[in-house]
């Protein structure tokens, strides 16, 4: 994903702009993996996997293993919000089954 694309992206949930929270791999102006976050009071997170921004409501859980690789590099508040999202997702799946 080109860095210049970030300014054109919008969170589907909050309608706010997306910001690059963390970038793990970059090749020149391309982001290979990282994490985008909404610029709103209720934060929503979207991973960038293999250069593709995954901007879907369940993408954080779908790509959980990719996000877990670099979660320790985020600030404590973001780490907690993301981990709580993973826990909630597991709880919901358990309740459905």
Q: Where do the language-model regions lie?
A:
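Conserved N-terminal segment of class I S-adenosyl-L-methionine
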Residues: 2-97
């Amino acid at each position: 994903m080109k860095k210049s694309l970030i300014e054109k992206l919008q969170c589907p949930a909050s309608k706010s702009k997306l910001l690059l929270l963390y970038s793990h791999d970059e090749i020149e102006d391309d982001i290979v993996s990282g994490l985008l976050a909404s610029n709103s009071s209720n934060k929503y997170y979207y991973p960038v996997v293999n250069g593709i921004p995954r901007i879907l409501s369940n993408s954080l859980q779908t790509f959980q293993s990719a996000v877990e690789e670099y979660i320790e590099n985020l600030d404590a508040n973001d780490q907690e919000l993301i981990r709580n999202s993973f826990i909630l997702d597991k709880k919901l799946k358990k309740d459905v089954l």
